[in-house]
Amino acid sequence: MTNYGEIFEVWFDGANGGTGYYGGANEERRVDKKNYYDWPGTIEIVRELQPNAVIFGDAGPDVRWVGNEHGFAYPTTWSNLMRDSIYGGMPEYAKKYSSGQENGTHWVPAEADVSIRPGWYYHPYEDHKVRSLPELLDIYYNSIGRNSSLLLNFPVDKTGQIHENDVRQLNKLVAKVKEDFSRKIALSGSNLSASSENGEYIVDNLLQPEMETFWNPKSGELPATVTIDFGEEQTFNRFLVQENISLGQRVKSFALEIRNENGQWETLAKETTIGYKRILRLPDTKTSAVKFTIHDAKDSPVISHLAFFNAPKLLLAPTIARDKNGQVSFDLSEEGLQAFYSLDGSDPKSGGIAYKESFELLQPATLKAVSKDPITGEFSEPITIAFPLAKKKWKVMNPEKDASKLIDDDPSTNYTSKQNKASIDLGENQEISGFTYYPIQNRYMSGLIKDFEFYTSLDGKNWQKAVFGEFGNIANSPIEQQVEFE
């Protein structure tokens, strides 16, 4: 506590007891989670040695665990907590307390925590499993955008540094978040009106960036509404709203409406809590006016800020998968994008086939695809996949029920042979020049193939060895292995 400089946060994990070394003895222990630890004394030490640090734990006392390790807060997230009813490692904490309580006795805001990798510590075999940009964006919007702070873990590698793959993804996240909020809809020329105003706390205060200025309707007047007339059509897909939390968290439910082409109000979103910050990701919405309505609140609402943004599309190449039966499907990084592809390796940007639905591809082909933003006309970087002959006629001859997982082209499934071998009937004579092996991708791996022999047969009885070898670094780099016959 005294050799690290100033510490921002002291983090007390809820896990305790279990198997480990206790005073030199390697044994398993179970502890009374409620009374075993001297939390008052421990907190006193932190306050003395690091007075500016916040303390994290199930019960805080300053910030609390959000109740999962996915990095997501909840659609309803209160910063208040029944703190005195909770202790570290409490079995029912995640279900009962982690989203906070409307009438909680203490201010203990949520902190979402998640690792940028599958685990909290560094392992070389996870270097290719760093979270994708879409995953990281989901984490951001479902934590920061849901009245929570975010702790994003970066395991330190054996050099004492954060791995370059992790840094690359973090930089992408930072750049995309900045881009999302760079196109703010200017409200200075808009006409703002409110259902009521309380003295100096007028609706125009919403245009000020300071938290201390806010709009406050007259006491007891709910629903309370703010109407924003842009004066002309605007397009947005992000909505941000904040309460002045120095006066507490109050809003229990709110809605966002837009004025449609017929001049009628149409509901765009219905949500619950706001807190320090609530961000909604919305479909591309074009309108000339918006209505923000607070339907329920613990006390007269104090709204410090609201804003609209037109975030550019996350323009990534499609994620492409083909199943055992040769059915090819595309997954786009964001709604509203289009995809184009070719099956001969040619540039799909010009003359490519528009992807509408999954399609059958049985024969070998070089599929090249791009995503397109129809609004800007911009294309993503291309993705190229060399598909071999589909496995539609293949059959695994091993007797185990799950043997078919060996060839199902689903990276999330796996098969372990009790005989350390597998035989596959290709359904017909085929000319092959090699094979690929995709190792198990579970967090805790077993059954990795290190040494191998590969045989072929024309009748299933007489076998000839085609190739043998070793997957040298498979434990540290469990990526697809490609072997060519000589």
How should these model regions be labeled?
Residues M1-L222, I228, E232, L240-Q242, ...:
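Mature catalytic domains of secreted/periplasmic carbohydrate-active enzymes
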Residues N171-E233, Q242-R250, K270, Y276, ...:
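Disordered, acidic Ser/Thr/Pro-rich linker "stalks" and the adjacent N-terminal cap
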Residues P283-H295, E486:
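Noncatalytic modules at the cell exterior or secretory-pathway interfaces
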Residues K298-S300, P374-P382:
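Short, exposed coil/turn segments at beta-strand boundaries within extracellular/luminal domains
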